[in-house]
């Protein structure tokens, strides 16, 4: 039976981490004392949902969390993996702004009442998927995935946590910019977005996508897409930004 530990202190645990070529012990007091921390925990590094959805969205929303008073966003990928696995996973996720914490012995997870058996998958003991908001070592809110078969991912996501922390905060936009090297109009579009304070992901022709992909969208770069809607090239972006500013 999973435990909702809202109102309780987090377990006192020492995590054994690896930094460079040295072992570094990290205590829960060092992570949580006097700080506001968002924690999300998951079954395992490099697993599908964790790698494609859970970690990337928290990583994307780190600036939003910090804007609303969060000191640290921790993937206590208390996924019951060791520090070597967690360090490599962090690299592949390009998630330097997240704190990846290995709970190799499952002590923190067990203390949180979230340790479950995954023997049917050959995983052994793992963390159930959940997230929590912790202030000065005390759990203020937990979002625990329902106890159903499979790997539910309904309430522990970054957007749910952000909505709890800052209900009136505007939802961040998902912006992609398709570019190519040496394109001055691409530079203009990116600069316009930066000046408007809009974060975006850049996709470079022949590195991140092909001519065939571009032709499916348009005949030239740059192309800017926002929340699934194609805005267009640099002039269209300027017009969209002006319209947005006057709204």
From Swiss-Prot:
SUPFAM superfamilies: Thioredoxin-like (SSF52833)
Domain Glutaredoxin: 163-247
PROSITE patterns membership: GLUTAREDOXIN_1 (PS00195), THIOREDOXIN_2 (PS51352)
Enzyme class: oxidoreductase
Stretches assigned to the Thioredoxin domain: 4-170
Alphabetized Gene3D superfamilies for the sequence: Glutaredoxin (3.40.30.10)
Family annotation (InterPro entries): GLR_AS, Glutaredoxin, PRX5-like, Redoxin, Thioredoxin-like_sf, Thioredoxin_domain
GO biological processes: cell redox homeostasis; cellular response to oxidative stress; hydrogen peroxide catabolic process
Top-level lineage group: Bacteria
GO CC annotation: cytoplasm
UniProt GO molecular function: thioredoxin peroxidase activity
Entry coiled-coil feature ranges: none
Enzyme nomenclature, EC number: 1.11.1.17
UniProt keyword terms in alphabetical order: Oxidoreductase, Peroxidase
Catalysed reactions, semicolon-separated: 2 glutathione amide + H2O2 = glutathione amide disulfide + 2 H2O
Function recorded in the entry: Catalyzes the oxidation of glutathione amide (GASH) to produce glutathione amide disulfide (GASSAG). May play a role in GASH metabolism under anaerobic conditions as a sulfide carrier necessary for cytoplasmic sulfide oxidation.
Annotated protein name in UniProt: Glutathione amide-dependent peroxidase
This protein's encoding gene: garA
